[in-house]
Amino acid sequence: MTRTTEPTIHLVPHTHWDREWYEPFQRFRIRLVDLLDEVLDRAESDPRFHFTLDGQMAAVDDYLEVRPENRDRVAALVRRGQLAVGPWQILLDEFLVSGENIVRNLELGWARAEALGGVMPVGYLPDEFGHCAQMPQILARAGLAHACLWRGVPAGVDGHAFAWTAPDGSAVRVEYLAGGYGNAASLFADPARFAERAAALEAALRPRFGDQPVLGMYAPTTPPRCARWSRSSPDWRRTTPRSAC
């Protein structure tokens, strides 16, 4: 893809979801329910809006336990491709579980996502602090050709994509989330500084992306007024990890 006009930023609306961390599970679930209530309303009112649910079905399960009446709404958005779910049941630490656990995790998440309307066909692993050598083999055997990583990637990776190869020769294409899964989180915080921040993000990531659109991972919702901001800044569009890979 060759850049023909202004630089392009591909923005992925998403959340990174820790079920339990510095607060108990139920406190985090309150935030999850509030978030997805807003996401469902936004997606239903704007067919251009897409949202990625962190690659793990557990967030869907936790939400629907509180909002079972919204299952059909969630499924409709999954079927339309506006809500990207799976392929994992949970995001895992690859060194704390067995190899079979990793495979079963993927199997379960994949099946549950398909039952809801479709699985995101990306090995989404943004927050693992290291990766087992066989992970590309596991992903490839599952039929996944693409992955997204942030943590656990060697410092020597200086581009935005690379081939990740397992000992058996299996390989997947990795989109490296340079700057992390929130590298564009502050982009829309201040309307007066949108152009400045968008240009700064594009400039910071351009060396990695060359003539390709740069990838920005950011907060879940975009204020409607943002559409006009791009006139004085790099062109941008909302997308999903699958489209960005």
Residues covered by each model-derived region:
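Catalytic-domain carbohydrate-binding cleft regions of carbohydrate-active enzymes
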Residues: 1-245
